[in-house]
Amino acid sequence: MVTQVDCDAIAAAIDEAELTELALTLGNIPSRSGEEKAAGEFVHDWMAREGFSPRKVGATPERFNVIGTYGGLGVGKNLLFTAHLDTESPTRDPNLDVHKYSPASLADPEWERCWLEDGQLRGYPIANDRGPMSCFLIAAKALKKAGYGLAGKMYLTACPGEIGPEPIEEHSGIAFLGKDIGAHYLFHHGGVAPDYAIAAEGCDFGWTSVGCGYAVFRLRLWGEGTFTPLLRHPDAAGDHPNPIYRVGKLTDAIHAWTRQWEAASRFESTGGIAEPKVQLCAIRGGVPFQFGDGTEVVSLYLEVGLNPRQKVADVQHALEAMARAAGVGRFEVEPVVVRHGFEADAGEVAPLVGAVDAATRLGLGHAAERANPVYSSMWRDHNVFNMHRVPAITTGPRRWRPRPKDLADSALIYALTALEICGRAELGEAAKGSSVYPDNPFGA
């Protein structure tokens, strides 16, 4: 059991200024999805300097996972911390971004820059997810600095691709892989054997063992191409041969279906509340420079959140029924991306939740509460571990505009949690030397 003495000793070993500098330095390394190499190299080198024996394990040389280890000096449980190296941002391909972002959004410096202003850390890379990553790195350093050895192993992992992308349509192949080469790849090929896992992400110091998945569906409307001079317009747009004219009818139906689906999809368990959401994310139809005869096909792309109990087939059937009822003509519904949601078994994850609660009570003076439903209503990489029967939660500091103290508090909670889960061991219990000869090999 961790004590106030442990809390005070570890807190004294956490340098808030060092933690802030680490988060800012790491956050200011450009690391969009697909371009995580430089940030990964930085984390690897930091772990090496601090003595955490890092390794690189990746599906490609440019997008590797970094795995460091602290502890493993005796008999104890293993706790894995993970955070992602990539951060959401425009593609920076002007031919793509022009169809998604306004000029003002593209000019937002927080996509790729981080700084301290009025006591708050600004910049999306710190919020998601290199601030929490810095917290568990400093947590491991503080344990070591304060003289706490761990019986079990504390894995420190930094992954690419948690945000994405996803291979869809012509944007396919290895270059567009996301989650498949991050924590998924780490679990299968990273040489880790965790008893528990924490996805370190901003949760406002709450926790949840619930995670949503998602599916992206392509809803395709078919029609007829008509030479423009021969076109005769019907009275109703829904009867037009050009399927683009029927998009309005379909989006009205999708909007009504969305409200019903979201209400029916709310999910609550002891581990959290999931409120999965639905949103149209793209539309494609026709070839702008090849005009003159309209188009025969238009596609809408619909993102559908999935709670831990929902399956993609359920959504497929519901969307097909919706489109038939709407009378939109010939249509096709097909999932182009599928990732189910997961939750931890309440009994199996209880020791981890209890450790986080004890650490939070010592560090912050109050209990660790279930996180806001928004943090249970998205994909986070605790899903990967719960999928594979490793009890996992996501928990971490203030999500939006964290203060340096928030990061320091989170580092303390992570360190105390690791001490509770992994157990104590004397640092001197590590293996001595590596020579092939003992001290007195020949008895002289």
Predicted regions span which residues?
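Metal-dependent amide/peptide-bond hydrolase catalytic core
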Residues: 1-13, 17, 35, 49, ...
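N-terminal helical capping/dimerization or prosegment-like subdomains
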Residues: 2-102, 299-301, 315
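Active-site metal-coordination/substrate-binding segment of hydrolases
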Residues: 76-155, 164-166
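Short glycine-aspartate micro-motif
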Residues: 78-80, 121, 195-199, 218
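Short beta-strand segments
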Residues: 82-84, 157-159, 198-201, 220, ...
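Charged, glycine/proline-rich intrinsically disordered loops and linkers
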Residues: 90-116, 166-188, 270, 367, ...
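Phosphate-handling active-site elements
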Residues: 117, 139-157, 256-264, 421-429
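Acidic/histidine-rich catalytic neighborhood of metal-dependent amide-processing enzymes
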Residues: 123-212
